[in-house]
Amino acid sequence: MARAYVSLGANLGRRDANLESALALLRREALVEVVAVSSFRETEPVGLVDQPRFLNAVAAVETDLSPRELLERLLAVERTLGRTRDGPRFGPRTIDLDLLLYGDAVVREPGLDVPHPRLHERRFALEPLAELDPGLVVPGRGPVSALLAELD
């Protein structure tokens, strides 16, 4: 069984309800156990900044799914909650689920990059990761605490 970390974000609709709905759907997934959830944080948008503020969190999950299978489940949850991908990249969204880490695996495949390739640049993901596991190490990058310090 692997420990994976999934980021959750929303900036459209009832953001808190969107995150809670995503967590509820994840909890119903076979072979996925949500073992911890960070606090919810309001954050500024990244990339396309002229949009509403985000509500972000990270969930720690235990899973027997492969990284690809877990990603497919995350995308299915997004679709169930009305996520469409026809808008601008980094644009507003009802829900956004990203696979940040999958144990100590490093995966580079079409459509799947683990650890998330921009994780080390994203305070909105690093802070909740540090809340869940202060000693967590991002493969190929180093401790989450050091990555956060580099952003200061």
Enumerate the predicted regions with their spans.
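Short, structured patches in soluble enzyme cores that scaffold and shape functional sites
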Residues: 8-10, 63, 130
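Flexible, gly/pro- and Lys/Arg-enriched active-site loops
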Residues: 31, 46-54, 65-152
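N-terminal beta1-alpha1 ligand-phosphate binding loop
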Residues: 1-32, 37-42
